[in-house]
Design a protein with these regions (language model features):
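Gly/Ser/Thr/Pro-enriched helix-cap/hinge segments flanking short amphipathic alpha-helices
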Residues: 1-195, 229-230, 354, 397, ...
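Short glycine-/Asp-/Thr-/Trp-enriched loop segments that recur within the blades
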Residues: 8-12, 188, 240-244, 300-306, ...
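Beta-propeller blade termini
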Residues: 15-23, 192-203, 223, 245-256, ...
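Hydrophobic beta-strand segments that make up the repeating blades of beta-propeller
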Residues: 29-34, 115-116, 208-213, 250, ...
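Short glycine/acidic-enriched loop and turn motifs that connect beta-strands
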Residues: 38, 215-218, 268-272, 324-328, ...
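Asp-box/WD-like beta-propeller blade repeats and closely related beta-sheet repeat scaffolds
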Residues: 238-248, 267-312, 332-333, 349-357, ...
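Beta-propeller blade signature
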Residues: 278-285, 333-341, 392, 451-453, ...
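Solenoidal tandem-repeat scaffolds enriched in leucines and small polar residues
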Residues: 294, 298-369, 375-377, 382-384
């Protein structure tokens, strides 16, 4: 801490600061706003004390019309073998601004090789061999040419067909605030829909799709016609179940009659128990008309109520994952392995054939894949506060081989999983979506994120305290106000914010309560791929930085650019967080070009054409009647988005 050495250690209550070169000496001064006191002005004496002869350049812009300051312009310099860029955006909040001029520190370099300004109207001007240590003024009226653009050798790989191929569907999630029940839970769990499934449901050889509904919104089946358009079909059974919230779905032949039936997972975090949390199996009459199969004794499904998260279907088995126990975030919910008798009747065989799978964790997604090439499908499950869990099929049972597969030390907030051969060796690899690295919450093996779950101070309600490391110390993320709301008895111990200060969880919670608490850990938040070594183990590799900007809720693998190598499309975002954490909205969809060896590089938006905003929950590949390939994107509280993939040549 160099505050005292730099002269910035004056006591006060400050809520704003701005940098500005007030005396035009090339050193940025500091103005600090104080409550109930005059503003403080700190003169920067760096130039007075500079013995190394450092240099600067300040650029003032004069723009057109009302934009007199050239706001939005980009100023770039090349000097001393390095490049710098300043985008003129001086606003820093309500009625707040920094110095609107572009300031460049040049170090020992006394001349700028080139200075380029790109104005908001895309015109530009270039100056060369500019002397340092001065303020220069450039006017937009002197800009005479547009900047050179790099010609594109190929059109974008994706084009948005959403408006040209309209589908009469928009997910309409109801408003429910999970924090009202559990104020200390890390994030909402009530925005996990909509479900999405693709398949030929009426036997005409064309792909159709199912889009799930929210509470009080029925799901819908869309049949594709010969022109490649989609129309909704009447489904009375869906309307009867419109109270349920559809978070995942799968199309498969459940009853062995040759057509695709529909399994829909009920979830959300609003319902405590009862019928809205019962999964549903809808049987197909072969023409795309669905009727609900009964649950219970003699029915198609066993009766179970859960906050479901996913469905993974294989030939004989269904894995149904659960995310949370209502009002008890952090308690491991029950998940299910269901076995099909071949005629559409499923029984719960979890305890019999997959010991430990019932309490596998807070499940997000799962997939079936024969990862070791023995001809039998294995189950891989991902979720929050858990490693990638591997259940290997052995003699008709599923045995936990997580440690043997190499995933024991990879606990995260995993959000999605996709199996594909990413490096061309004939073995299935995994694409694993996670929280990403653009988060206030950090996690590593040395400094994991932790969740302490317990009835602290014995108030009769379960509470969750999330901690993360800062400067080598693990602190709760919740502030004094949030903790006092959940545990009012703390008020006498922490009457002021100063008294709460840098309190650790062991300072806040009694030792006996901490000993009894359930502690969950996460040590990696990076989205990754897991390459199959061929010996029953996987090797994790983080995806490129561009894939870490937001959580990845959906991914697709395929050769999207026609070079014969597997590429990836990823999408995500998540808004249901506290203001402190800040919503995750930095993903606009991403194409990752594969090199055929398991390496991936991000493709810029101009080349890919992808622009997928919003909270993506599922993506699926679909073939149109004319042979064109589409990506269908299901987004929370939004329309279905359709992205056409450029034909392969």
């Amino acid at each position: 801490n160099l505050a005292a050495q730099w002269g910035l250690n004056a006591a006060g209550f400050s809520n704003g600061a701005a940098y500005v070169d007030l005396d035009n000496d090339g050193a940025l001064d500091l103005v600090v706003n104080n409550l109930n006191a005059p503003a403080t002005v700190y003169r920067n004496r760096a130039r007075d004390l500079d013995s190394a002869g450092h240099h600067f350049l300040t650029v003032t812009l004069r723009g057109y019309g009302a934009n007199t300051g050239g706001v939005g312009a980009k100023v770039m310099i090349a000097a001393g073998g390095s490049h710098q860029l300043v985008e003129v955006m001086p606003t820093r909040g309500f009625e707040s601004s920094v110095d609107p001029r572009a300031h460049f520190g040049l170090g020992a370099t006394s001349r700028v090789d080139s200075l380029t300004v790109i104005w908001p109207d895309r015109r530009s001007q270039v100056l060369e061999n500019v002397a340092a240590d001065r303020i220069i003024t450039l006017s937009q009226s002197d800009a005479r040419s547009h900047p050179p653009t790099r010609p594109s050798a190929h059109p974008p790989l994706f084009s948005d067909l959403t408006d040209r191929l309209p589908i009469s569907y928009k997910h309409a999630d109801n408003t429910f605030f999970d924090f009202g029940r559990e104020p200390l839970m890390p994030h909402l769990l009530s925005t996990e829909g909509p479900a999405l499934a693709v398949g030929d449901v009426n036997g005409d050889g064309r792909d159709d799709m199912y889009a799930g509904g929210a509470k009080w919104q029925a799901g819908a089946v869309f049949l594709q016609d010969a022109a490649g358009r989609f129309r909704a079909t009447p489904q009375p059974a869906f309307r009867a179940d419109s109270l349920d919230e559809d978070v995942d779905a799968a199309l498969f032949d459940a009853d062995g009659d040759g057509d695709l039936d529909l399994y829909v997972v009920s979830g959300g975090n609003e319902f405590w128990e009862g019928a809205p949390l019962q999964d549903r199996l809808y049987l197909n009459d072969g023409r795309g008309n669905f009727s609900r199969a009964e649950a219970g004794a003699g029915g198609a499904l066993p009766v179970f109520f859960h906050n479901g998260s996913c469905i993974a279907a294989s030939g004989d088995f269904l894995f149904v994952g659960s995310r949370v126990v209502a009002r008890q975030y952090g308690v491991i919910p029950r998940s299910y392995l269901l076995e099909n008798d071949g005629h559409g009747h499923f029984r719960d065989v979890t305890a019999l054939k997959a010991p430990g799978l019932d309490s596998v964790g807070m499940v997000s997604r799962a997939t079936w894949v024969d990862y070791d090439g023995d001809g039998k499908l294995d189950l891989i499950v991902v979720g929050e506060w858990m490693p990638v869990r591997v259940f290997h099929q052995e003699n008709g049972r599923f045995v936990d081989r997580t440690t043997e597969a190499g995933f024991a030390g990879a606990s995260g907030w995993w959000t999605s999983i996709q199996a594909a051969d990413l490096n061309g060796d004939g073995r299935p690899d995994l694409v694993l979506g996670n929280l990403g690295l653009n988060s206030l919450i950090r996690a590593s093996r040395a400094e994991p994120a932790r969740l302490y779950v317990g009835d602290f101070f014995e108030t009769g309600t379960l509470k969750q305290i999330l901690t993360s490391y800062r400067h080598g110390v693990s602190y709760p993320l919740a502030g004094r106000d949030e903790l006092l709301q959940a545990m009012p008895s703390l008020r006498s111990r922490y009457p002021t914010y100063a008294s709460f200060g840098a309190s650790r969880i062991q300072d806040i919670i009694p030792r006996k309560d901490l000993k009894q608490a359930r502690v969950l850990e996460a040590d990696t938040f990076a989205s990754a791929i897991a390459l199959n070594r061929g010996d029953g183990t996987f090797e994790l590799h983080a995806l490129p930085a561009e894939a870490q900007f937001a959580p990845i809720y959906a991914s697709l693998a395929g050769d999207f650019d026609g070079d014969g190598k597997i590429d990836l499309v990823t999408a995500g975002n998540f808004y249901g967080v506290t203001p402190l954490e800040g919503r995750y909205d930095a993903s606009y969809g991403l194409l990752l070009r594969g090199d055929g060896r398991g390496g991936f590089a991000a493709v810029d938006m101009e080349q890919s054409g992808l622009a997928i905003d919003g909270q993506v929950r599922h993506m699926a590949l679909l073939k149109r009647a004319n042979g064109d390939r589409l990506i269908v994107v299901a987004k929370n509280n939004d329309r279905l988005q359709l992205e056409q993939i450029a034909p392969l040549h």
